[in-house]
Amino acid sequence: MLKKILPVLITLAIVHNTPTAWAAEAPKTDSFYLPKSLDLSPLRLHNIESNPYGKDFNYAQQFKTLDLEAVKKDIKTVLTTSQDWWPADYGNYGPFFIRMAWHGAGTYRIYDGRGGADGGQQRFEPLNSWPDNANLDKARRLLWPIKKKYGAKISWGDLMVLTGNVALESMGFKTLGFAGGREDDWQSDLVYWGAGNKMLSDNRDKNGKLPKPLAATQMGLIYVNPEGPNGKPDPVAAAKDIREAFARMAMNDEETVALIAGGHTFGKAHGAASPEKCLGAAPGEAGLEQQGLGWANKCGSGNGKDTITSGLEGAWTTDPTHFTMQYLSNLYKHEWVLTKSPAGAWQWKPKNAANVVPDATDPTKFHPLMMFTTDIALKVDPEYKKITTRFLENPEEFKMAFARAWFKLTHRDMGPAARYLGDEVPKETFIWQDPLPAANYKMIDSADISELKDKILKTGLSDTKLIKTAWASASTFRGTDFRGGDNGARIRLAPQKDWPVNDPAELHSVLAALMEVQNNFNKDRSDGKKVSLSDLIVLGGNAAIEDAAKKAGYNISIPFTPGRTDASQEETDVSSFAVLEPTADGFRNYYDAKRNTLSPIASLIDRANKLELTVPEMTVLIGGLRVLDVNSGGSKAGVLTNTPGQLNNNFFVNLLDMSTKWTKSPKAEGYFDGYDRKTGKLKWTASSVDLVFGSNPELRAVAEVYASDDAKEKFVHDFTKVWEKVMNLDRFDIKNN
C-alpha cells in the first residue's frame, strides 16, 4: 500500500556513480525550476499501477493460505546457519534480526501516523541508508531465501516482524503473539524526516524543541543518539530525549524502559574501528556492483570481529543469545565510568572492569561489559530508576511488560485488530488498538436500508447537516496508520464531539436526531435486527447526497454495506485520539493558522493523501462538497453556486469562468473575492484551497474535465464513487474478506 506520503519539503537525489555528463542531462521535477510549485506526487503514488501484483491482488487472502509454522521453522534454521559473507555473532543471527524488526517498526510516530513496519519501508531510501540502520541490508539479504520461497504469501513487512518474534522465542523469551497483514509498499515514501539534509543533524529547532510531527531527535536515527544528545555523553539529557522520542512513538515510561531493557538483553554493538576510515557508502550511494548493499568495510576481514555498525562496541550481558535479567542486574551491580570504543564513540564500562563477555567470533576471548549513555539514563533519571528497580525485583513483571511493549511496538501502526491475520493473534485487546465491540445482532437488509433512509430524511435535518456529519465522522481516517474513520461512531464521544472543525453544537443536534431514529428502529424488535449509530451516520450522508443529486436532476443510489459497530467512551483513549483532530481540512474549508506548520494548500494535499485519494478523486470531492455547502462554521467560501445543496458541477464551471476577476480579500489572509469583470459586483468568495484548482495547471486540467458540458453526469457519478470510498476506508472487515 502506498501511503504515509507527505509533500516533499526537501528533495534528496541519490545518484549511483553516474558520470557528470549523464547527471547534467537528468530530468528535473517542477520544484527544481519552480520551488513554489505544488507537488501532487503524494497523491499520484496512490495509483495501483506501481504494484507488480496488480489491482486485483488481495494480500489478506494470500496470507491466509500461508503455513505460518513452516515459515517459522525456516526462520529458525536461518537463525543458526552462519554465512561466510556475513557471519553470525555467537553463531546466532537472533539479536541482529531483533534490531531489524525493531528499527522497521520504530519509525512510527503518533502525530501523523507515518513510519512503522507496515509497507516494509526499511527496504527503500532514505531508511535503507540511515546510519541507524547500518548493515540491516545484510539482515534482509539473509532472509531473501525465505521471502523467495513463500513469495506473495508473506510481505516483507510481515516477514521482518515475524523474524524478530521468532528470534526472541528461540532465545528463550515468550512473546505475546504475532499478527500478519502488513501490505508491502513498492517505492519510497515521501516523508518529512526533518529540516536537515545531513545525516545525524539535529532535528530540534533553534529553541531546542522537537517540532511536530517528528519523533527522532536526529536525522537518520530511529529514536535518540545512544552516545547522548548530539553525541554528548550526558545521561540526564539523554533521559529527556528518550522520554520525548518514545512518547511521540506512542510509548509511556514503563513501555520505554521495558523495550530498552528487553532489547539490550540480546546481542552486541559493533565498533571495531572508525566508520569514517573503514566504511564505504551507504546502500543508496554504493556502486551498482554492490547490488543494493552498502557500508562495505575495507578494514580487516570486513565482517565478523571487524564489523563496524554504530561505532559503539561490546555487549550488555555475558549471555547475549539468551533472555536473562542480566541487563538490569548489570546496570545496578556496577559503577559505570565513561570510556570510548575502539572507533572513538562514547560509551560506559564498569569501574575495574573484568573481561567477562565472550567474544562474538572467538570463544577463547573475553571482553568487559558495556553500556550506552542511553542505558545509564535509565539508572539516573528518577522515574526510569523507579521502573528499572521494580523490574529488577520482579522478573515476571518485567517479562510481561517487555512482551506487551514489543507487541505494541511491532503492531502499533497496523491500526485496529480487524486488520490482524493469522493464528497467533492475541485474544486480548488493547486500548491502543482503538477497539470496537462485536455486533451481537442481525444486520439490516436492503428493505431496512430504504426504510431508514426515508426516516432520516423525514427528521427535518437538512441534507447539508447530514453530509457534514458523515464527512466529519469518516474523514478522520488516516491511511498512514489506519486509525480513525466512522466505524465506532466515536464522533459522539470525547474528544471528537468537541473539535471546533465539527461545529459541536450543530453536531450534537444531528446526532440526537439520528439516535432517535436508531432507538425507534431497534426497540421491541422480534427479528433480532439492529442498526448502529455509525451505520446510520453514513447512511444519513448517503441519503442526503442521493437527495441532493435528485434535486439536480440525477437519480443515483450509493452502495451501502452495514456492519459498523459503536464504541464506548471506555474503549476510546482521549489523549490518543486527540492527535487525529483536523487542524486543517480543506474539504470543509477549515484552517487553524495557530496550529499548523503547513499552508492550507499543503494541508489539503496531506489530508487527501491520508484519505488515500488520487488527484482526480481529491478534485471531484472538493467540487462536490463545495456545492453541497458543507463548510465548517457555515462559511460560504468556495460555495461557487447559486443552488447550494444541489449536487452539480457548478463549482468548476464558476471557478473557470473568465467573467470573474479574483482579488485578494482585504478581510483575511488566504481568502479572495471574485468580482464580475463588467459590473464590478461581488459574486463569490473563496479560499486559497478553492482557487488552487484554477491556478495550478495540473489541478486545472482535471477541473476542466468536470467543468465541461458533457461531464455533468460524470461529475455526479465520480463524486459519489469517491464518497463511497471515503465512507468505507475503515471497513477492514470487508477488505480482508
Curated annotation (Swiss-Prot):
The keyword Signal applies. It comes from the Bacteria. Formation of the three residue Trp-Tyr-Met cross-link is important for the catalase, but not the peroxidase activity of the enzyme. Heme b binds at residue 264. The record marks 99 as: Transition state stabilizer. Its EC number is 1.11.1.21. The keyword Aminoacyl-tRNA synthetase does not apply. InterPro entries: Catalase_peroxidase, Haem_peroxidase, Haem_peroxidase_sf, Peroxidases_AS, Peroxidases_heam-ligand_BS. There is a cross-link at residues 102-223 (Tryptophyl-tyrosyl-methioninium (Trp-Tyr) (with M-249)). GO terms for cellular component: cytosol. Residues 1-23 form the signal peptide. Binds 1 heme b (iron(II)-protoporphyrin IX) group per dimer. One of its GO terms (biological process) is hydrogen peroxide catabolic process. The active site is at residue 103. Keywords: Heme, Hydrogen peroxide, Iron, Metal-binding, Oxidoreductase, Peroxidase, Signal. Gene3D superfamilies: 1.10.520.10, Peroxidase, domain 2 (1.10.420.10). Pfam families: peroxidase. It catalyses: H2O2 + AH2 = A + 2 H2O; 2 H2O2 = O2 + 2 H2O. There is a cross-link at residues 223-249 (Tryptophyl-tyrosyl-methioninium (Tyr-Met) (with W-102)). Its cofactor is heme b. One of its GO terms (molecular function) is heme binding. Bifunctional enzyme with both catalase and broad-spectrum peroxidase activity. Belongs to the peroxidase family. Peroxidase/catalase subfamily. HAMAP family: Catal_peroxid (MF_01961). Homodimer or homotetramer. This is Catalase-peroxidase. It comes from Yersinia pseudotuberculosis serotype O:1b (strain IP 31758).
